Design a protein with these regions (language model features):
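Extreme N-terminal starter segment of soluble prokaryotic enzymes
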Residues: 4-9
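Active-site and donor-binding regions of nucleotide-sugar-utilizing enzymes
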Residues: 10-178, 308, 312, 322-330
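Short, charged/polar "capping" segments at the starts of alpha-helices
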Residues: 44-52, 128-129, 149-150, 258-260, ...
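Short acidic-hydrophobic, aromatic-tinged amphipathic segments that line or gate anion-handling sites
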Residues: 63-67, 299-305, 355-361
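A nucleotide-sugar donor-handling region in carbohydrate enzymes
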Residues: 143, 151, 156-247
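Conserved donor-binding/catalytic core segment of Leloir-type glycosyltransferases
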Residues: 243-257
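Catalytic donor nucleotide-activated moiety binding site of glycosyltransferases and closely related
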Residues: 253, 274-304
Length: 362
């Protein structure tokens, strides 16, 4: 392990996490020369050559890759993750599960996290949160996605039943609960407090719009160079050659529903707009539906990058950006944001699958 005193590190699981971390550091360096480190977890996301591009950009001091381990990779850990039939037995085994899942990460942590002044973790519900709990390392949690607490109160949904007892056990460090409830979580950062279902008392608000407003033209160019691996190709696809003068509509896909239902859902959206608009599809990184094959009359942007970086591309504009449940604010490249929401999704799958927070307070 390497050791780094008196600085900070960001732990990221998605391109969006890395994007926000870069934005934060670009803003910080307007007033400070001290650089942070960044750690990219490979557990659920393929970052491709992002590490190399981050290193070239020089925004961070060091860039680490983290081979984070899910509980299912260990028979011992999973042996303590079985329903014992009553809440007392389940919570007793959960104490052991919490410790073992944290311990499972130890050989794979690439730097000494206890040496940092500030540890920032996006999506601390992943095993890294258990590691920090196991090692008693204090950290700052950051919301997984923009206003993600609006549709999924992650901590409450993952801890249905005996919530006050579980919360008390987490406060003692016996079990781990994400999103601000861990004994070792200093604070839980969100974009907008009012956009969340419920929040822990240590919540802090840092609006992403305020961060974005502090970026310089040079900062925007740095973001484009970091997050667009094939910048010229992507920009060419987005802007086109000028021969199609119809209004531009961008559809953001998501890995919703079963594959056949997803095809129907996004096919219906495309059908509504394709006649009178130049339709651009930006698939979610985890969406494996073959949009090029299914919808050949659209422009499909397959490169993996956070949607937010589109606002950093000079000269790129669309008339509408359309989302089903992805939360969108401050989308500067779009004249209009169309958010279809849960009522639209209800038409395609059982509402109980995606309406996760509505029964929590009943």
């Amino acid at each position: 392990m390497s050791k780094r005193d008196n600085t900070r590190i960001y732990i990221c699981h998605t391109y969006y996490h890395a994007y926000i971390a870069v934005v934060k550091e670009l803003v910080k360096r307007h007033t400070s020369d001290a650089k942070a480190d960044i750690m990219l977890s490979t557990m659920s996301n393929d970052f491709g050559k992002l590490k190399e591009r981050l290193e070239r950009a020089g925004v961070f001091d060091r860039v680490f890759m983290f081979d984070e381990k899910e509980d299912v990779t260990s028979e011992e850990v999973m042996s303590y993750h079985r329903d014992k039939g009553n809440i007392v037995a389940n919570l007793l085994q959960r104490i052991t599960y919490t410790k073992l899942l944290g311990k499972l990460q130890e050989p794979h942590i690439p730097t000494d996290l206890s040496a940092y002044r500030d540890v920032y973790v996006f999506c601390d519900s992943d095993p890294i949160g258990y590691y920090l709990n196991y090692k008693k390392i204090r950290y700052h949690a950051i919301e997984d996605g923009l206003n993600s607490g609006r549709l999924d109160d992650q901590a409450r949904n993952a801890n249905r039943g005996a919530w006050p007892l579980k919360r008390a056990m987490a406060a003692l460090g016996l079990i781990f609960i994400e999103s601000g409830y861990s004994r070792y979580c200093i604070d839980y950062e969100v974009n907008d407090i009012s956009a969340n279902h419920s929040l822990p008392p240590n919540v802090v608000e840092e609006p992403r719009e305020e961060l974005g407003n502090k970026l310089t033209p040079e900062d925007h160019a740095i973001l484009v160079n970091i997050f667009l691996e094939n910048k010229d190709s992507v920009v060419s696809q987005l802007i086109g050659d000028g021969s199609d003068t119809r209004p531009q509509v961008m559809i953001l896909t998501e890995p919703l529903c079963e594959m056949d239902v997803r095809k129907k859902l996004f096919g219906d959206i495309i059908d509504e707009y394709k006649e009178d608009n130049r339709v651009i599809i930006k698939p979610h990184p985890r969406d494996v539906l073959d949009y090029e094959k299914e919808f050949p009359d659209t422009i499909v942007i397959r490169d993996k990058f956070p949607m937010e970086v589109l606002g950093d591309i000079e000269g790129f504009k669309v008339d509408k950006v359309i989302s089903v449940i992805t939360q969108m604010e401050n989308v500067y490249f779009a004249k209009e944001i169309v958010y279809l929401g849960l009522d639209f999704l209800d038409k395609y799958e059982d509402p109980s699958i995606h309406r996760k927070t509505e029964n929590l307070d009943k």
